[in-house]
Amino acid sequence: MGVRPRQRPQRLAEKLLAIRTALGLSQTQTVKSLGAEEMIVPGQVSEFETGKREPSLIVLLRYARLANVCVDTLIDDDLDLPAKLPARAKHR
């Protein structure tokens, strides 16, 4: 039995960019708001937003918390971000 390649979320990059722009943050401010200064540098935010690189699970979790959405919203291509960010209530 072979291992199937993992499917990459197609809309993740656009969602991460949408979160940052909706919150009015620069890439540097995004890193600080995520509390991820020891994990990522501002240039990586650009790579996440263009799809050149995927963030780690912990960074995805922090993006979800920043936007007040569940991680599923970020990685499931069938789910859209709320019209207003940060969202009022988290999905559980």
Question: Which residue stretches match the model-derived regions?
Answer:
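A short, Lys/Arg-rich alpha-helix, primarily the initiator
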Residues: 1-23, 72
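Short, charged recognition helix plus adjacent turn
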Residues: 1-6, 65, 75-92
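Helix-turn-helix DNA-binding elements, focusing on the entry/boundary residues of the two helices
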Residues: 16, 27, 42, 57-60
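Residue-level detection of the helix-turn-helix DNA-binding "recognition helix"
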Residues: 21, 35-36, 50-52, 79
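Short alpha-helical DNA-recognition segment
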Residues: 24-48
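Base-recognition residues in the alpha-helical recognition helix of bacterial helix-turn-helix
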Residues: 43, 47, 58, 76
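DNA major-groove recognition helix of helix-turn-helix/homeodomain DNA-binding modules
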Residues: 52, 56-73
